[in-house]
Amino acid sequence: MKIAVLLSGGVDSSYSAYSLKEQGHELVGIYLKLHASEKKHDLYIKNAQKACEFLGIPLEVLDFQKDFKSAVYDEFISAYEEGQTPNPCALCNPLMKFGLALDHALKLGCEKIATGHYARVKEIDKVSYIQEAVDKTKDQSYFLYALEHEVIAKLVFPLGDLLKKDIKPLALNAMPFLGTLETYKESQEICFVEKSYIDTLKKHVEVEKEGVVKNLQGEVIGTHKGYMQYTIGKRKGFNIKGALEPHFVVGIDAKKNELIVGKKEDLATHSLKAKNKSLTKDFKDGEYFIKARYRSVPAKAFVSLRDEVIEVEFEEPFYGVAKGQALVVYKDDILLGGGVIV
């Protein structure tokens, strides 16, 4: 089978390509220029080229920087301006990697596209679904909720059945040169955030704009450094007059540049809604497991679809729900889709 492999210049994607080559597939390497300095792109392309030379496969470089900026990066900035906590990876996957890049791969005659994502594809009754990775600590299925069945059927995740801790030893044994590659240490999960998301925002908007902090009764009880520097659940970085116990951000009013704070129990949510829904075609109202943050433990909830809006009623209180984050629905370890929390 002819498969396109997205190569980032790192160990995971390189080993993904190696494992597919060992299985006898015909491969085409693809490097995506999305958002980084030219210096970084040059290094990553050089690393990807070394992997391709080792495997004896071609490498194509696709420049999607303009598309990425308008569809993902600018949306990230806008969401924070609106007081939300966005999830750019959940946007990038369907639009860039499994959108534009997949389209290009199909034009090259490839039947499928592979990445180093920690996830799996499972076929149930001839329909392809995303399944959680074996390594639950590194599972990335959460970011793939917006993919259609027809797209999922064209995906390959060679690392989905492996543990993250085993990848590097396996890769170095198979491809010794990987241990000598120069690289940049990424400090954030978001590819275009080099130091902190606040530093990224500062390049485009006024972040340090002091405002007031109010309690749930609407009383002014302190000050903050600028609403975009805070997310739901944060308990530091603002001043509360005479505070004797911890206060947490429970609400953000972007238009007024105000924070609303409360006690930890005030972070509890019993229900929520999500828009821009992307659910499996056979979805039915019922009890499922929910993730409302990437690192959150799946929570039991009753999920229903009302006029294109996903409505969730949690079995137990869920803490720290932020507007703009992805709400993802699972049946056991099978991904059924999700939406954006409103």
Curated annotation (Swiss-Prot):
Gene Ontology CC annotation, any one: cytoplasm
Annotated catalysed reactions: S-sulfanyl-L-cysteinyl-[protein] + uridine(34) in tRNA + AH2 + ATP = 2-thiouridine(34) in tRNA + L-cysteinyl-[protein] + A + AMP + diphosphate + H(+)
Signal peptide annotation: none
Keywords: ATP-binding, Cytoplasm, Disulfide bond, Nucleotide-binding, RNA-binding, Transferase, tRNA processing, tRNA-binding
Listed NCBIfam families: PRK00143.1, trmU
Name by which UniProt lists this protein: tRNA-specific 2-thiouridylase MnmA
Cystine residue pairs: C92-C191
PANTHER family: MITOCHONDRIAL TRNA-SPECIFIC 2-THIOURIDYLASE 1, TRNA 5-METHYLAMINOMETHYL-2-THIOURIDYLATE -METHYLTRANSFERASE
Record-linked HAMAP family: tRNA_thiouridyl_MnmA (MF_00144)
Gene3D superfamilies per UniProt: Adenine nucleotide alpha hydrolases-like domains, HUPs, Translation factors
InterPro entries tied to this protein: MnmA-like, MnmA-like_C, MnmA-like_central, MnmA-like_central_sf, Rossmann-like_a/b/a_fold
Positions of ATP binding: L6, L7, S8, G9, G10, V11, D12, S13, L32, G116
Function of the protein: Catalyzes the 2-thiolation of uridine at the wobble position (U34) of tRNA, leading to the formation of s(2)U34.
Subcellular location: Cytoplasm
One Pfam family cited in the UniProt record for this chain: tRNA_Me_trans_C
Ranges in coiled-coil conformation: none
Record family assignment: Belongs to the MnmA/TRMU family.
UniProt xrefs under CDD domains: MnmA_TRMU-like
